[in-house]
Amino acid sequence: MSFKSGFVAILGRPNVGKSTFLNHVMGQKIAIMSDKAQTTRNKIMGIYTTDKEQIVFIDTPGIHKPKTALGDFMVESAYSTLREVDTVLFMVPADEKRGKGDNMIIERLKAAKVPVILVINKIDKVHPNQLLEQIDDFRNQMDFQEIVPISALQGNNVSHLVDLLVDHLEEGFQYFPADQITDHPERFLVSEMIREKVLLLTREEIPHSVAVVIDSMARDEETHKIHIRATIMVERDSQKGIIIGKKGAMLKKIGQMARRDIELMLGDKVYLETWVKVKKNWRDKKLDLADFGYNKKEY
């Protein structure tokens, strides 16, 4: 029996549903989600394997006009996948008209010379007539291999999109073991789950100014719990105060919510200890970016 495999990048502007789509395909949380733009900062690999095929999805940071060194890293990280994949899923929202950000991405895709499938997400939010207008508009911008409307949140048409990808795959190797779902280490996934709760519970400038560093992660042989010590990094003292909250209430809530998700992922009881530290302007300092996991060599 022949086996098919290939690498597929998921590209698009911030907040179009790329991570929601990946998590739905994988059947579990691989990439964190929030309603904040630029939630995904690193390339996230999701490995979808059946008896007949393996699709290695690469969820990328939302492409935007960068204002910091972190933003530069995110955009470069997204575009670098064009050199690594067999197919690109270019995702746009059905409830927003094509904008400058979409046009910028389209120009890069035209030059990349890789097959592109246009994925119009959030179809549950629009009338069919509006969807048809969106399809016609994008069809006139470039020659897409396919145009597929979906709702990643509700799962509408997602399996059809996966089937289309399989049809376009060529025979190849199984690159990863069947039970492996991502290439990121557990420490990275743990840090992302903590950051997700910060994004969920805070507002304004806080989400963009936060990084999470896992200082230690080890099993206690007596209690059989996994002890995790994590530091939430911010850029200003005022941000530190907001995350800690009145009498530590906000930090406690972040820890409780994150611990539940981490326990589900690891399948073990977890003792999570969180601290908050200030590192001024870390998003514009390359050494800090590397220390906090935004390293071009790795992701």
UniProtKB/Swiss-Prot annotation:
Gene that encodes the chain: era
Matching InterPro entries: G_ERA_dom, GTP-bd, GTPase_Era-like, KH_dom-like_a/b, KH_dom_type_2, KH_sf_prok-type, P-loop_NTPase, Small_GTP-bd
Gene Ontology CC terms, in alphabetical order: cytoplasm; cytosol; plasma membrane
Domain of life: Bacteria
Pfam families per UniProt: KH_2 (PF07650), MMR_HSR1 (PF01926)
Cell compartment(s), UniProt: Cytoplasm; Cell membrane
Activity regulation (UniProt): GTPase activity is inhibited by GDP but not by UTP, CTP, ATP, GMP or cGMP.
Keyword terms, alphabetized: Cell membrane, Cytoplasm, GTP-binding, Membrane, Nucleotide-binding, Ribosome biogenesis, RNA-binding, rRNA-binding
GO BP of this protein: ribosomal small subunit assembly
Complexes and interactors: Monomer.
Name used for this protein in its record: GTPase Era
Ranges for region G3: 59-62
HAMAP family per UniProt: GTPase_Era (MF_00367)
Residues covered by the KH type-2 domain: 202-280
Organism: Streptococcus mutans serotype c (strain ATCC 700610 / UA159)
